[in-house]
Amino acid sequence: MMFSGFARSIAKTLCVLSLGGWMMACSDDYKWDNENPSYLNSSIYDCLKEKGNYTNFIRLIDDLNYADVLAKTGSKTLFVADDDAFKTFYASNNWGVGSYEQLSTSQKKLILNSAMVNNAYLLEMMSSTVGPEPGLCLRRETAADVLDSVPHFNGDQLPTNYNPDDFDYWARFRVPSKGGIYMALDNSNQMMTHFLAQQMANKKITDKDFSIIVGQERSKNDAFIYDSKVLEQNITCQNGYVNRLDKVLITPQNMAEMMRTNGKTDIFSHMMDRFSAPFYDAELTARYRLLYGNSVDSVWQKRYFNSQDYRPLQNDQGTDPTGNPNGNTIKFGLTFDPGWNAYQANSAVTKEQDMGVIFAPTDERLYEYFFSEKGGGRFLLEAYAPEEMANVKGLEDKENIYRAVDQIPRDVIQALINNLMKEQFCNSVPSKFETIKDDAQDPMLDETHLDKIQKVLLANNGAIYLMDEVLTPAQYAAVSAPAYVSKDMRVMNYAIQKLTWMGTAKNFYAYLLAMSSRFSLFVPRDGFWYIDPVSFIPKNNNVTPRAIYYDWNEKTDAMRGTSYPITYDFQTGTYTIGDTPMSTGAASSTELSDRLNDILETHTIVHEDKTDVSGIDETATGVECDQHYFLSKNGAPVYVKNAKQHASGMEVQGGWGLQHDESQKVVRFDDKTRETNGNGNGMAYQIDGAIVPTIESVYSALYNNQDKFGKFFELCEADNSEILETLKPYLNKDAEGKDIYTNAEYLKRYAIFVNGGGLPCFDKQTGTIVTQATNVRFFSNYRYTVYVPSDAAIQTAIEAGLPTWQSINSYLELDKEPEQRTEMTEAEEEARNVKAAAMVTALMNFLKYHFQDNSVFADVPALAPTQYETATLNSETGIYCKVTVSSSGNGTLNVKDTAGNTRSVLDNFKNQLVRDYVIASNQISASSFAVMHGIDGVLNYKTLTNGRYDSDWNTTGAAKRFIKNYQIKD
């Protein structure tokens, strides 16, 4: 017999046994060489004939010329249905077939080939992949071939697209004279999905999962092929195995076709089909013509544009081989191709190990989503299809529903579809719902969604959960959604979605998708001005300020930034923007992106719960609360007034606006909060211009207010280099006498202001540049508060022994010529220098103590006493010295120092907004924002002994101890 080798191999598996250390071996004249064991049936074909109740299946085998294969050769695994199962099938099936005689050849092939695996497998081994790797196999190939069924589609059966801006790939085939199209629904072969105990255990698919997905209960060792139960397992034949099913196995179609034909997901299927196209398949055409003759000119396959890593389709080459042979790049796409029979999630997971999942909303739910007053997708139709939406008469008015939904651009509607497509079935069973993430990587489902599952459809390449809920993507629920769909906020949408900054994709859209955050997003309409701070840096000794006009170029469909010159009057703070774009000195594309990044972060406020400090939980109120000042993502203060009036009077200002009496009005308001919509993360406000931050630095604010704060500015700004050189052995030596820092680093540590790439300080009376050394040395890309004591307060401190650079200079006699200085012994000079070093240490720590981490404003709400760190470090403890800030509300602010002194902010200098820029290669590489307040007294980082500063160095020993405790280390 031709299959005797297979039979012999089965018998010989019992030949060698090892049990309890005993081995039984086979001789060469083993009896099963000439005689079959009793459990071994004849061939698969003969076995079925002998049993007598498989006449329908035998007819399939005979009609398709498979009798010799299944009677004389091997090896096969067959899943068969008996005549009783066929009787039930004829009574009710989707094909409308009432008897065997009514089956077409294609249908016969589908039944037989889909039930046949081209190898002999024990059922329990079918859960193993090649290796073998037990418990990994969910699906496997069968004898089915794509040519078993290549249907013909008439024009009215093909996808339609009502969006005039979309290229309709199907249009030419819908023309009646064309006569339709012969099309494979995919050019890969259908696979068999089986639920076997070992694979389910390995992938932690529970019996409850199975019952929800398949709609049946299972016992421990049950095996199912799709929803067909194996009633009789592993009937062993001489050329393979037969398994009897409880019903006729009809391999289901792929997910795309199943959604198109099940009658409950027509709208969702239509939405997905907008991403499909017919692709000419030369190989399939040749095979078809070889098999069926030359009556068919061409065979096409239906594919879906997708961005899957493993098998992406992002070019339409092949849709028009003659007219456009090279095709075009496609900018939209689904998560994966739902029509791909041989679906594979990625290179690490084979097609046998997993399949896809779609959480498809029913027609009823999608209709509510788009057309009900509170539907989560209504804003899309309001933006793109207001007229078409008005024409829809109800759920049954499918054509007008399609017409309306199709107006939503594909690169917008894909967010909804892709959120509902998950790449791995084994990780998406009901028991794992809480691990499934949405497009923001937040939890998308929980156990309550089990009640939302209307039914599960098993396709040949995945599972479809029919959902009584539309799981809206974060992209639609987030504050960025209005910009995402609006036609007049495209510049900001570009910044959110596609901006590249410093050579790296910003991916700000992902940040704004966080549903656990609460945002207020301000979005200027296209056509807004931005005062470019970098343009105030002199080039070739000239300053040419410019404003950038951001708008959307309709011709190129791209963001555009045009530079215009500014005429600026520093004395009055007024300016005019020129009418003609700059021919030289215009911002480059890199600079445009850089400033757009600054705009993006300035317009985004991330709210926090500040109940403990101000009594306001901003995560609940957003900006609609009893305060005016808020900090944006990059630390820029934003002033908000009339917040609850929305588009009827709400205004916002940045530092530039406050200093130039300009404001941006809210022209549209979108509530995207979770409280209102069930999912969301804040409020979106469209404004009529950009919020522009200040260009004034801490240095500039002090320099140009010397009439009030000249003494503090003088202490911060004075040249102390000669003093530091003299005291270097006392301030920059370790215990072994080695330098702690390089000379440059040492000198920098005793400076308040440095040249760190910041904007120059302009004298507001003359307009001339004072200096470019304007950056606070210890600011570090954060937000701060600077307290500025009045001249009277500084003078009182000086009278109490606070050293000044001038007094230290005089104490060291550096203001005298060398020959005029007092002669001292080495010990006397040592003692003097130690005391002078203590004075320097005291003065530096005094100044730094007025620079506080975190920005605190004199605003409407009262503030509970709250401690904040300053820039002064107790080097002995390693702890930064703190101040305690409080307010009784209504614009007041009090600061209490370590010594217990409470100072109040001055009404004539409070809430002054400043910013220290760090500019590199004409880009804003970093910046620090601060708010400045004048105060009516100085702040002391320690309690004064006898009310005097100089008590800390009245002896050499005291001076040394003081230096040790407060040495300047950063």
Please describe what each predicted stretch is.
Residues 1-26:
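Sec-dependent bacterial lipoprotein signal peptides
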Residues 25-970:
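Mature, structured domains of secreted/extracytosolic soluble proteins
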